[in-house]
Regions:
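Short, leucine-enriched amphipathic alpha-helices that occur as contiguous helical runs
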Residues: 5-13
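Short amphipathic alpha-helical elements of helix-turn-helix/winged-helix folds
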Residues: 14-18, 30
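Short capping segments at the starts of secondary-structure elements
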Residues: 17-25, 36
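Alpha-helix C-caps/helix-loop-beta hinges
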Residues: 19, 68-69
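A short acidic, leucine-rich amphipathic alpha-helix
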Residues: 26-29, 65
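Short, positively charged loop/turn segments that connect secondary-structure elements
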Residues: 32-56
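Short amphipathic alpha-helical interaction segments
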Residues: 50-67, 73-76
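Short, amphipathic alpha-helical interaction segments positioned at domain boundaries
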Residues: 67, 77-116
Length: 116
């Protein structure tokens, strides 16, 4: 990890490595500074929502190149979010069509440490 990375960011990456992967809800529950805002992570082209209710610092963390080099997103079951106690009340993306969905869908996502 780069020396310029904030310690709290290193703590999140260390936690994800320790537990083998975590949802945005789990990370928000564990590290309160990631949530509590009105920011959203989304993929506008296919009209997919990844997570919402994030703080500006949380979005900066997830969008940081150094973080993205270490953590890898992947789709997961919505049941992991139910277990974490936070879900989005919207349709879940299953198989995004070419050109994306007409109405935005939620893609439950977890982060894990990249191999290598």
């Amino acid at each position: 990890m780069g020396d310029d990375m904030k310690q709290e960011w290193r703590d999140v990456i260390g936690y994800v490595a320790k537990v083998g992967g975590a949802t945005f809800a789990e990370l928000e529950n564990r590290f309160g500074w990631l949530g509590g805002g009105d920011q959203t992570l989304e993929l506008p082209g296919p009209n997919l929502l990844i997570w919402t209710g994030m703080s500006a610092e949380g979005v900066a963390f997830y969008m940081d190149r150094g973080v993205r080099d270490q953590l890898e997103p992947s789709a997961c079951s919505w049941l992991l979010y139910a277990d974490d106690g936070k879900m989005l009340r919207m349709p879940i993306a299953k198989r995004p069509p070419k050109g994306g969905y007409k109405k935005q869908r939620w893609v439950p996502t977890m982060l894990s440490v990249r191999d290598g």
